[in-house]
Structure formats: C-alpha cells, structure tokens
Amino acid sequence: MLSRENNELLTRVERGTPMGSAMRRYWIPALLAWELPAPDCPPVRVKLLGEELVAFRDSRDRIGLIDEHCPHRRASLFFGRNEECGLRCVYHGWKFDVDGRCVDMMNEPESLHFKEKISVASYATVEVGGVIWAYLGAPEQRPALPTFAWTQAPATHRHVSKVVQETNWLQGLEGGVDTSHAPIMHRVFKADSTRPGFKPTHPFVRSKAPTLVVDVTDYGYQYASLRPLDEANIHVRTYQFILPFHQIRPSQSEGGHPIMSGHIWVPMDDENTMVFNWDYSETAPLTDDDRLERRLGNGPLDVDQGTFRSTRNRRNNYMLDRQVQKTESFTGIEGINTQDRAIQESMGRIVYRSREHLGPADKAVIQARRLLLHAVKTVSEGGTPRGVAGTYYALRAVEGVLPRDADWREALTPEMSATRIEQTV
C-alpha cells in the first residue's frame, strides 16, 4: 500500500512537481532517430513531462527540441517550415534556431531588433543508439551521456521501438519490475504453440512461486527471482532497475542465442507514457525473427508508426479472443506487451495505490517506490539522486539453472557487470 500523498508525489511529473524535478536530472528518450531522417525534414511533436515540444533536424544536421508554441501568438511550430537552419512559424514568419533564439521576423522591421528580445524554451539533445535523448534540467547538473551497452551495439545488432501506453508512467514501470506475473499472465497452454508466451516446458511455468531477492545499488537495484525446479536445481532470472525508469532483462532469440532487452517508461504527462522497447545481441546481427517486437506486440503491424498507438487498445478490448483464452493462452490477447498494456490500462490512468494489498511477491515494486521517493527527497534537498553517475551503463541481466546449494550472486553477478551493492532486502 502507498499513501495517497506519496502516490501523488510519485505520479505527478509536470513542471514544478517534486517528481518532475527529479526526472529532469536524467537524460530522457524523446523520440526515435528515424523520425527525423534528414536535415530540414518535417518537425515532430514531442511531449515530455507535460511539456508540449517540437523536435527538428536543421540544415547542419543539428537537432533542436523547443517549445511547440511560438511566443508571438502561441501558434504551433509543428506546422512550421524547417529551412535554412531554423524552424519558421507559418503564421507570421518568426524563425527559431536549435537553441531557441529568434533569428528572423518577417512581420517586423529589422531596424527594431525586436528578434533579439525573443526566444523559446530549448533543451539539450544527443543522438545515441538510434534514439534522440533530451535533458530538461539545469545545464550545470547535466549527467553523463546515456551510453548504455545496447546503445553502443552496431545498428545491425540492435533494435528500438516505442508505443504509447494510456496510463501514468509508474504503472508501466511497476509492471516491468513485477516478475511474478510473467509466468501467469503470459503463459500459453501448449508446448508446440506458435503464440508468443511462456510454454508449459519453460522453467517459469514449471516452477513454483518465486522467491524474490532485491539488492539495492548505487543506480537502483538488481533483483532475482529464484524458482525451484526439482530437488537439485533452481532457475534464477535476474533483472536490473536503473533510476528512474529503465529496466534490463535477459531474453532469447527465436534461434536460441542470447538477446538483452528492456523497456524505458517515459512520462509524456501525468496520464500517458511513451514506452521505449529495445533489444540487442552481443554476438550476431538481429534477424527479423530475432526482433522481439514481433512477439511483444510493439512492431509496425501492431503499432501505428505515426501516432505510436497500438491497434489493439481499450476501445476494441485489445481484440480479446475468448476462445483463444479458453484453449490457447491465459489472456486471449495477442502480444506479450499488449497484454501488459491491457491489464495496466484496466487499472485506470493513475492507480489508487492506497487500496492495494501487497505481498512478498511484490518486493521489487515496493523497493522501486522507496528508491523513487528517496530520489525525490534527495533532489528536493539539493542532492544528487541515484542513477546519474554513468557507472551503470555496462549493466547486463542474465538467467540460468543452478544447483540449489549454489550462491547465485557468486555465479551470475560477474556476468551482470553490477556496481557496488549497498543493501539486500
């Protein structure tokens, strides 16, 4: 259970809120690089932390992220002309460069020098790993560049997609760090099923309810689900949570070679989230079959590539098939992440967490809330929150079958490149 006051504290992210101020200490994924494919291409609307922005790539290939609304009469710069190193409002011809400076006014005499008094809000950007990231905080507090391991893989070895989730960001994050739901909600009933999900033979499904261990670190936490398989062995699956909204988890390609994957739950505003989904291989280029979006429900066949809204959504009950639910899969909904969105959106835009009843299986959710509340407090007191140092960029997540008497940390932590563990809960 979370008090109503703390629920408000964690879920409200717009400017001037404590959580919004904490979020502005981190690099935030803003859009996919292919959305701005070339200099002087059309601008793109972006909404981050309640701010309505527009992104553009200028004639010199520089990326601008500025207030969407022209300061003259508040017309949208989305309709503007991206030309000659600036974005020009089509209403009265005011033009702004990537730094937000007004560089030309078509309706005012040059002799007045009025343009020198006008600017729009602009934010720092960097293109890393096929994603354009934004920093909305104070320049002197800018953190290390977001060079996560997946962003450094060759373009042929990684893939990134995104999809809108119609809930507050915390619902998505909590669903991501909640491992106990996966073998329940995402299971399929037949060993030879072609539907995405955990088959009856998977250790997730074969084992009993997991024991969860959470190790708090200087970036967030690493956590493991320990599932008994038989008298001799346990299945261990580890994850990483990096403040404020990153998850890293182990996956596997259709061909069987390891793939690392994860999600980033980016708050658009208090009630909508843009979920960035990434996967990469350390050993081989990704094939079309390898790309997890096909199984997760995040690909072009499932998500409109203009609006980034899922074709399976609350307005059509996520195309739930009751016959499939009866005979083939636990939910009857196609796509693992589509199932996640369906259930998380069913909880309302912002969950009333004061009405929850949490148990031991919710340990990772509880600890995530504690760390986020601590980050809010740290920032409000002028400190530096966890997760901005950049020491965590090489983190990985792994899974394996180990003897029951094995020390899973000793066996697996070296493969996770984890930094200092501070406490265990």
Over which residues does each language-model region extend?
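Rieske [2Fe-2S] iron-sulfur-binding domain
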Residues: 1, 32-159, 209-211, 231-234, ...
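A boundary/linker detector
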Residues: 1-27
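Short, charge-rich amphipathic segments
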Residues: 4, 18, 22, 102-114, ...
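C-terminal catalytic domain of Rieske-type non-heme iron oxygenases
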Residues: 15, 37-38, 62, 133, ...
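Short, flexible, glycine/charge-rich loop motifs used to bind or transfer phosphoryl groups or to couple energy/partner
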Residues: 18, 77, 162
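A short, structural micro-pattern
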Residues: 24, 119, 126-128, 259, ...
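Helix N-cap / beta->alpha transition motif
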Residues: 31-32, 168
